[in-house]
Amino acid sequence: MPSISHKPITAKLVAAPDATKLELSSYLYQQLFSDKPAEPYVAFEAPGIKWALYPASEDRSLPQYTCKADIRHVAGSLKKFMPVVLKRVNPVTIEHAIVTVPASQYETLNTPEQVLKALEPQLDKDRPVIRQGDVLLNGCRVRLCEPVNQGKVVKGTTKLTVAKEQETIQPADEAADVAFDIAEFLDFDTSVAKTRESTNLQVAPLEGAIPTPLSDRFDDCESRGFVKSETMSKLGVFSGDIVSIKTKNGAERVLRLFAYPEPNTVKYDVVYVSPILYHNIGDKEIEVTPNGETHKSVGEALDSVLEAAEEVKLARVLGPTTTDRTFQTAYHAGLQAYFKPVKRAVRVGDLIPIPFDSILARTIGEDPEMSHIPLEALAVKPDSVAWFQVTSLNGSEDPASKQYLVDSSQTKLIEGGTTSSAVIPTSVPWREYLGLDTLPKFGSEFAYADKIRNLVQISTSALSHAKLNTSVLLHSAKRGVGKSTVLRSVAAQCGISVFEISCFGLIGDNEAQTLGTLRAKLDRAYGCSPCVVVLQHLESIAKKSDQDGKDEGIVSKLVDVLADYSGHGVLLAATSNDPDKISEAIRSRFQFEIEIGVPSEPQRRQIFSHLTKSGPGGDSIRNAPISLRSDVSVENLALQSAGLTPPDLTAIVQTTRLRAIDRLNKLTKDSDTTLDDLLTLSHGTLQLTPSDFDDAIADARQKYSDSIGAPRIPNVGWDDVGGMEGVKKDILDTIETPLKYPHWFSDGVKKRSGILFYGPPGTGKTLLAKAIATTFSLNFFSVKGPELLNMYIGESEANVRRVFQKARDAKPCVVFFDELDSVAPQRGNQGDSGGVMDRIVSQLLAELDGMSTAGGEGVFVVGATNRPDLLDEALLRPGRFDKMLYLGISDTHEKQQTIMEALTRKFRLAADVSLEAISKRCPFTFTGADFYALCSDAMLNAMTRTANEVDAKIKLLNKNREEAGEEPVSIRWWFDHEATKSDIEVEVAQQDFEKAKDELSPSVSAEELQHYLKLRQQFEGGKK
């Protein structure tokens, strides 16, 4: 059974360079190991160290709360004493570890035995442990441990891999080990200063609540600050004392100051407060003054330094939540819960957030039968916030007035009126602090986000009174690319509210009802300016007519509505997945159009970084903060997920988390440990491994490839292609150069992105295209001619555009046109009345021209044809399919043997098999497909021969059993009890190949081969 999890305890660690264990005082040892286990282990957390594993022992000479250990190889810390948190763990055995050795030491330390021998002085003899990231003797470093980051080393079980250290730039995480704050190693006088003078401190926001000795029901959590204990000594106060703070403009507040919980890496001379208080203070530097000569400590309430207000007025900050009547019950209950149990310290102008669950609140507000649900449930899992602002205290609206205490038993609380104050921008982490989902940050990789940010700032700034009438249409060819999300994120960064109006929800029984609903929603939104109004799915109410080109009757009236609600400090935005369906009259009303495509590789990299960013976590493993193992590359994840949308990437990370949990659950069953211990051994996080991601991405590909057209990377390597060494070199020169050296093509030099394979059928043209995609980790699109044809005018050309757009979305990508002569024949020679083939060729030419310009980088077009003489001449001009490679029939027996070796890589060949002898019997008219048929037939012959031999053995066995008076046996019984390894495994013999060769006829005749050689002479001779 897994061991019981133990609660952590605090202690003081003394650095001991010679210790191989973590030695504990008798008191600490008894607290952690009262049951006296045979092999005690402990993990400790300290500033800059996250749960390092050590074997534990008892040292009776140490003081009560003291322990000692050698931590140089864990963190390289120079500190002699440090506060730590100790935790008993039951470690697992490390199955595999990778250790890198400096190049100067590699000649003497290049085997696992030599490395282990060199590490003996550093490892405990009885219970050696190894930790990922450890800097070992002689400059060795532990790069990777499996299945967790640290654990026991067991002889015969733990496998050690030794690799030479690469001479590279120092990684950022290793550089961080030596980038310490020098103040951390200065000596502080830990006694409280006798003089209680004011001190200037910086202010910084917290990302999560910090527990204190005081209950939130007793003390105002929005009037707390946290500093390092050394800073408290400098101020001359105790933890829990009440101090006064003053900003540069003279505004004063009281603050209860606590010591930041140890261990921590927070900065000195910085006071950390809640993001709400940080915004309300409004200054990054404050003057902190202790309250008089006496300490106002934990036992003292705030009313000992603040008087209670007689009356306080709150105004709703206009926004989507405070103007929605269905949420009134929710935020009124939240206000009551905020003020009733606790005395709150407030000033005029302070913002007060009331978080709540909008889905549950709307259900309660709209359905009377749900009124029995307790209102406390509204704050359990919040997703929205209603903001309020203190507008008056004791009748004074002066922001410079003093701070008061709101006591529900003495203070009259009035909620009324509205204000259009801007809310707190998301640069201050208030969403994380309140437990809301964080909005993604759109960095420099998202160029369209900068454009939207400029539009939001201009339309909602002080210039908005000039009636700029700013409007923007965001459109995309695929759903779920983040049109509404980028608007929410950018507006939140600017502290601006967003009103989202779904046009599907506006559609009524008639035009008047639809327009009336729209006007009502716009009236509510425009009353909250400055804000952003988003009309989602605009094409649903502003459709272009499909018949005569005339707009529907509602369109002209909708134009008037949009004109009436332009300007006034509001950015009018609309989103659409198909802008071509929107009426031109409506579309022309939008001054800006921004296309948002499927995320590119750099954008996917940033999305994955956001999704895998470790948060504060929670109590259960499903809420534990996540981290990436050192061998997980975000760049590789971005490459493998080409063509996927942000919701798909989110699903991948969620699936990966579940797979990691399943992996740890299985590990707990196989070992005597708990999930809590496994998280501790992974430095307190749920660590995601490459195998977790591979399975999740494979699932996403399999599930969504058909519905969203996500291309896949094929699994065909050069080993599967034989006899094409010369062609391989030309391909590498054409494709590898722009991928490895893209900066060479940034100065106007056009790259060659089109390759045309031509030659007899069955020579491996399709196989070679897949090998290209696999070799360079490119996604692969295969396009067949009939897939592009459509009966409607213009749709065939649109299909060509969509193919190339998908390729650009999934780059780096290979677009493979099989049987290109059926897709792009010579123009003017077709008999179709509509000229559809000519238009397809023209569209294909236009798209190929775009591949060598901006936006086409990373997209390579490969065509294959048996009849290059039927292709349109324009396709073969420079910038299109200008690299023509002839894939012919092997003209030597050595090349034929190479092809057969590639085809039989996974065969079990008998000792008598000679591929050289077989190839010498083959004529020079055999294509690659013929050799594939030869090898397949040989395998089939071997299977038939083996099956006949098995049948003969079973027949003989049953005959003997019948003579002995026993029942005959079945084939299944024979395979379970009598079959040998040779009966189960099929081995291909020389006779199988010879039989297949004798029965095979070439697919290309000598006359046809001469025809293809003439074509080669025509194109390679006349086109050079």
From Swiss-Prot:
Keywords: ATP-binding, Cytoplasm, Hydrolase, Membrane, Nucleotide-binding, Peroxisome, Peroxisome biogenesis. It is found in: Cytoplasm, Cytosol; Peroxisome membrane. GO terms for molecular function: ATP binding; ATP hydrolysis activity; protein transporter activity. The keyword Nucleotide-binding applies. Component of the PEX1-PEX6 AAA ATPase complex, a protein dislocase complex that mediates the ATP-dependent extraction of the PEX5 receptor from peroxisomal membranes, an essential step for PEX5 recycling. Specifically recognizes PEX5 monoubiquitinated at 'Cys-6', and pulls it out of the peroxisome lumen through the PEX2-PEX10-PEX12 retrotranslocation channel. Extraction by the PEX1-PEX6 AAA ATPase complex is accompanied by unfolding of the TPR repeats and release of bound cargo from PEX5. PANTHER family: AAA-FAMILY ATPASE, PEROXISOMAL ATPASE PEX6. This is Peroxisomal ATPase PEX6. It comes from Yarrowia lipolytica (strain CLIB 122 / E 150). The lineage of its organism: Eukaryota, Fungi, Dikarya, Ascomycota, Saccharomycotina.
